[in-house]
Amino acid sequence: MVLIFGKENCPYTAAARADYARRDVDVEYIDVKQSRAYMEQMLGYSSGHRRVPVIVEDGKVTIGFGGT
């Protein structure tokens, strides 16, 4: 499963979600604006970087999304 931390109004988050959906990858989407705990969880993965999306796939963390 892939974790995507993002914000609903972020076009890069939307693009990442669409890309994984197109490839039929199981994704858990977490909107960091919904809870301080979600934001803290994202910051833990991203070493404090506040840029979204933060994608966690097979233990690898990617900050941002540039498409495929």
What are these regions (language model features)?
Residues 57-68:
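Non-catalytic, surface beta->alpha helical segment in thiol-disulfide oxidoreductase systems
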Residues 7, 12, 41-42, 48, ...:
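Accessory recognition modules or surfaces
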Residues 1-27:
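Local sequence-structure signature of Cys/Sec-based thiol-disulfide redox active-site neighborhoods
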Residues 31-49:
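Thioredoxin-like thiol-disulfide oxidoreductase module
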